[in-house]
From Swiss-Prot:
It comes from the Bacteria. PANTHER family: FRUCTOSE-6-PHOSPHATE ALDOLASE 1-RELATED, TRANSALDOLASE. CDD domains: Transaldolase_FSA (cd00956). Its EC number is 2.2.1.2. Belongs to the transaldolase family. Type 3B subfamily. One of its GO terms (biological process) is pentose-phosphate shunt. This is Probable transaldolase. GO terms for cellular component: cytoplasm. PROSITE patterns: TRANSALDOLASE_1 (PS01054). The active site is at K87 (schiff-base intermediate with substrate).
Length: 218
């Protein structure tokens, strides 16, 4: 499984990258706004800064909701850096845009996916990644992990190349469940990634080892 960090915060991206296990970054307009990054030029400079930190894919989302606007924005974003993946919402114009980008050799991440049907259309259009939103489905008493599992099974059965990028991950437990469901990628907050390191037996075992060492070595 690949790990992406879901943030536009450069310090968090650097910290995750220093762990040595980071494969990429996902961003969205809300995350960019949270960091106070406004205006097209500032956003694009920020994407380039992210690409300088991380060697893997960086998802940059279009703002337009019409086909012509998506194509224009997507081509401009893709031209910024080879690692940019154009993030497109799973709406009718988005599927058409993904098909266009596929023909042009531009990689895409189909986002805001909440059903198997949406994931099917994204794969048929040639999306590089599809992003089912685990946490948001859980918020409405649906089963986000089960959706990930069903999409993985469908892609395996029909031999689609689209990678399942589990998104809206809220916890370390979500990551483990996505691993068990067979997701190709999990995009997570830094806290969830670091949470994978934590286990009480690791802490107690280390404390015992250090105490025993001090007994012998003073």
């Amino acid at each position: 499984m690949k790990f992406f960090i879901d943030t536009a915060n450069l310090d968090q991206i650097r910290e995750a990258n220093e762990l040595g296990v980071l494969d990429g970054v996902t961003t969205n307009p809300s995350l960019m706004a949270k960091e106070g990054i406004r205006g097209v030029e500032n956003q694009r400079k920020h994407y380039l800064e992210i690409c300088e930190i991380v060697g893997g894919d960086v998802s940059a989302e279009v703002i337009a909701t019409d086909l012509e606007g998506m194509i224009k924005e997507g081509e401009e974003l893709a031209a910024l850096h080879p690692n940019i993946v154009v993030k497109v919402p799973c709406i009718e114009a988005g599927i058409k845009a993904i098909k266009y980008f596929t023909r042009k050799g531009i990689r895409t991440n189909c986002t805001l996916v909440f059903s198997v049907g949406q994931a099917l259309l994204a794969a048929k259009a040639g999306a590089t990644y599809v992003s089912p939103f685990v946490g948001r489905l859980d918020d409405i008493a649906s089963d986000g992990i089960e959706l990930v599992r069903k999409i993985v099974e469908m892609y395996d059965y029909y031999d689609y190349d689209t990678q399942v990028l589990a998104a809206s991950i809220r916890s370390t437990q979500h990551i483990i469940q996505c691993v068990e469901a067979g997701a190709d990628v999990a995009t997570c907050p830094l806290s969830a990634i670091k949470g994978l390191l934590k286990h009480p037996l690791t802490d107690s075992g280390l404390a015992t080892f250090l105490a025993d060492y001090k007994k012998v070595n003073g």
